[in-house]
Amino acid sequence: MKKNIKLYLVILSICFQACSQNSGEGQEKTLVRKEKTAFQTSNPWKSVTDVRADVAIVYSIKDHHKKGNMTFEDRVQSWRDRGYNTHFMTGIAWGEYQDYFTGKWDGKMHLDEGQVTQKGDTIWHGKMIPYIVPSMNFIDYIKETVIKRVIDAGIDAIYLEEPEFWARAGYSEAFKREWKDYYGFDWRAQHESAENTYLANKLKYHLYYRALDECFTFAKEYGKSKGMEVRCYVPTHSLVNYSQWKIVSPEASLASMPAMDGYIAQVWTGTSREPNFFDGKEKERVFETAFLEYGSMESMTAPTGRKMYFLTDPIEDWPRDWVDYKKNYQATFVAQLLYPMIADYEVMPWPDRIYEGLYRTSADTDHKEQIPRFYSTQMQVMINTLNDMPLSDNKVNGTQGIGVLMANSLMFQRYPTHEGYDDPQLSNFYGQALPLLKRGIPVKTVHLENASYSKTWEDINILLMSYSNMKPADEASHTHVANWVKKGGILVYTGRDDDPFQSVQEWWNTNGKDFEAPSEHLFQLLGIDPPYLAGEYKVGKGRVSIIRKDPKEFVLEKGKDEEYIKLINNLHKNTLNKGNIVLKNHFVLQRGAYDIVSVLDENSDTSPFILKGTLIDLFDPEIPVLNEKSVKPGQQAFLFNIDRVKDKQKAQVLVTAARVEQERRNKNKYEFVAKSPLNTNNVMRVLIPKSPEDVKITNHQGMNVNANTSWDDKSKTYFIGFENDPEGVNVSITW
C-alpha cells in the first residue's frame, strides 16, 4: 500500500510538473500578450494612479520617492503586488547620478563630463544633473550600479531613454578627449566650419551608439548569468523632432544593433506642436507633425522587425491649460492610430502629474485645478481601447506608395549654420512632405540606413529625396537606391546642392572620388551624365526626375508647391499608370470596429467629413450612440462602429473607461469586474441581446454602488456610469 501511495505521489508530482510547465508556457504567452500597453512612473503604486495598463515601467533606481522612503525594490514590488508586469527605465544622457558626478562612486569628480556650449556653460537637465558626454567610465558606472541592480530585482526589460547630445554642445574637456581618441587628431571647434560641425556631430552620434551597445550587451550577458533573457529598449524622440530641436541621437542605426530589441516612440503634444512652414505660414500643425513623427518611427523599425511602442501624453511638459491639452491629445492620439501595423502603446508617461497635477482651466485664467472629470473619463476611454486595439492590414485612405527619404545626418546639419545657409524649422524636410500630406496623401518616410533591407522598398513607388539637409553615410546605400530605380522605382531628387555640407571631407570626395556633391555619385550609378541638369531621365525600368530647387522653397512662400505637386501627379499618372493622385482633405482608417478620422485644414476643400452608422463617440465622455458624425477641418474623431461587431449575440463591453477583468458569461447573464483609478468616473457601453431584467453593481466589499444606467434599443447597448474603484467594481447583468 505504501509503495502504491509512493507511486501515486510520483505520478502526481510528474503530472503537477507537467501542468506547471504547460501553465508556464501559457503564462509566457500571456506575458507576451500582456505587454501590449504600458506606462512609466517613478512612484510606487497609488490608488489614484492605478492606470491598469499591462506594464508598469518603474523609473530610476534611487531609493526615494515623493512621499516617503522606499527602496527601488520596494517600488517595484508595490506594482507587482497589484498584478502588473514590471519593467525598468532610466536616462542614458541624464539622470539622478549625483553619486557619479560628485565622486562618491569612484572617488573622482566627474562634473567635467557634462555637455558644454561654446560659451562654456554646462547644459543641465536638473539640479546637479548635467547632460552627459558618455565616457567609458560613465558606462561602467551604469553597468555596475544600475543594470546589475535592476536585473538582480528580477526585471527582464530595460529601457535606456533619450540618448541625446545637444548640437550646440561639444566644447567640454571630456568631449575633446573623446575626439582625440576617435579621430586621432586634436579637437576642432564646430562653429569654425561645416567640416568641423559634421565631424563633431558624427562623434556625438557614435558616443551614444557606443553607450547603448555597451550597456545592452552587458545587460544581456549579465541576465544570462542569472538565467534570464533580458530585453533592451530605447525610448526616443523621432528623427523629425530631434532634427528640428537640434539634438543628435543614434536613432535608425539602433534598429540594427544586435543587443537592441525595440523602441518607444516618444511623440506627444510637446514634440508635435513645434511650428513648421507650409504655404508661407509658420505655425503649429500638431496632427500633421505627429503623423510624420510616428511615421518616421514606424518606418525606422518595420524592415528590422524590432518592437515599437507608440507613446501619447494627455498633457505635456510645458504648463498650459486643460482645453489645450485635450485638443492636442486628440490630434496626436489619432495620428498614432493611423499606423495599423503598430499595436503596442505606452498609454501615458508620469500618471502622477496627469492625475494629481494642477493646470489652468482655460487659456485666459490663472486658476488651476486637477484634471477635470470629463477629461479623465475621456482619456481613460481612449487608453482602454489600446488594450485591445487590433493590428490591421487596412491602409489609410488615399494615394499610397509615396515616400520621403530620411537619414540620421538630418541631425548633423542643424547647428551651427555656416556660410549663410539656413533651413528654417527643418523646411527642407517639411517642404517634401507637407505639400502632399496637406492634400490628403498619406506620405511615408523611408530611412536611408535601412536601404539594404528589401522590406524597406515594399509599397514605395515614388521616392522623394534631397541632400540639401542630410548626407549619405556610405556609398552602399546609393547602390540600393539605384537598384530600386532600375527595377521600376521613380526617384524625385530635389536640391540645388549648394549648402556648405556638400563639400565636407567624406567618402564621395576622398580615396580617389572627387564628386562635388554626394548626389553626383548616385546619378553616376543611375547612368545620368554631367552636368546633372533639371529634367527627367529614364533609368532601366524606372525614372529619375531632378528638380534644381531646395525643398524649403516649396513651403517658405505661399503657393510655391504647385509645380511640385503637378510633377508628382504626372509621374504617378503617366509613368506608373496609376491615375491621378487623390487630392482630398481627410484621412480615414478602419481598425477592427474602430473608425479613425482626421480632417485637414489649410486645404482647398473646407467641407466636413461625415461618417454614418451605429457609432459610439469615444472623444465624448458620455460615449453617446450616434447615427452620423460630422468632423470639421482641423478636427479628429475616434469612433466605435457597432455595425462591425462580429458576434452581436455575445455579451461584451464595447467601450469603457476602466479595465475589464474576470468576465463570465452564460445563456442570459454577463458578469465582470471593472478597475480604474480612484477619483475618476467610469462610463461603459455593454452589448447584450436585449434589455436587462436585473443589474447588480457592487464594490469589492459587496456594497451596492450608485450608478447611472440607460438602455439604447437600436444599438442593443446598456450604458453604465459609476465612480471608479481600483479595488474593482463588480457588474452582473441578467436579461
Question: What are these language model-derived features?
Answer:
Residues 1-27:
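Bacterial Sec-dependent N-terminal signal peptides
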Residues 31-41, 87-91, 159-163, 198-247, ...:
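Aromatic-lined carbohydrate-recognition surfaces of secreted/lumenal glycan-active proteins
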Residues 33-82, 87, 149-157, 258-263, ...:
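Catalytic domains of carbohydrate-active enzymes, especially glycoside hydrolases
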Residues 44, 49-54, 59, 161, ...:
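Hydrophobic targeting/anchoring helices
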Residues 57-67, 123-141, 193-211, 238, ...:
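The substrate-binding groove and active-site-proximal loops of carbohydrate-active enzymes
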Residues 71-125, 157-167, 223-234:
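Glycine-rich, aromatic-flanked loop segments that form ligand/cofactor-binding clefts
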Residues 88, 92-153, 187-205, 213:
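Active-site-adjacent "subsite" loops/lids of carbohydrate-active enzymes
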Residues 471-669, 673-675, 684-687:
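A conserved amphipathic helix/loop scaffold
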